[in-house]
Amino acid sequence: ETMLDRIASGDLESSVDDPRSAEDKRFESHIEQGKPYKELRMEVGKQTLKYAQEEL
C-alpha cells in the first residue's frame, strides 16, 4: 500500500492539507470583517509619516 493510498483512505493525513477547521475559518473571516478601514488607515498613516518627515 502506497502513501497516496493511505492518504486517500483517510488513514494518513497529508502534511499540506489546511489544518484549520471550518470554525477557524469562520472566526478568521469575522476578524477580517472587523477591520473594514484597514487600507484607509494605512494610507492615512503613510501621509502622516510623510508630513512629519517633511517638517524635520
From Swiss-Prot:
Q: Where is this region: Disordered?
A: 1-30
Cite the record's Basic and acidic residues compositional bias ranges. 17-30
Q: Which GO terms describe its biological process?
A: monoatomic ion transmembrane transport; symbiont entry into host cell; virion attachment to host cell
Site annotation Cleavage: residues: 2-3
- Family per record: Belongs to the picornaviridae polyprotein family.
| Highest taxon, organism lineage | Viruses
Q: List the disulfide bonds.
A: none
Q: What is this protein called?
A: Genome polyprotein
Q: Where is this site: Important for VP1 folding and capsid assembly?
A: 6
Q: Does the keyword Ion transport apply?
A: yes
List, in alphabetical order, the Gene Ontology terms for molecular function in this entry. channel activity
Q: What GO CC terms are in its UniProt record?
A: host cell membrane; host multivesicular body; T=pseudo3 icosahedral viral capsid
Its keywords, alphabetically, are: Capsid protein, Host endosome, Host-virus interaction, Ion channel, Ion transport, T=pseudo3 icosahedral capsid protein, Transport, Viral attachment to host cell, Viral ion channel, Virion, Virus entry into host cell
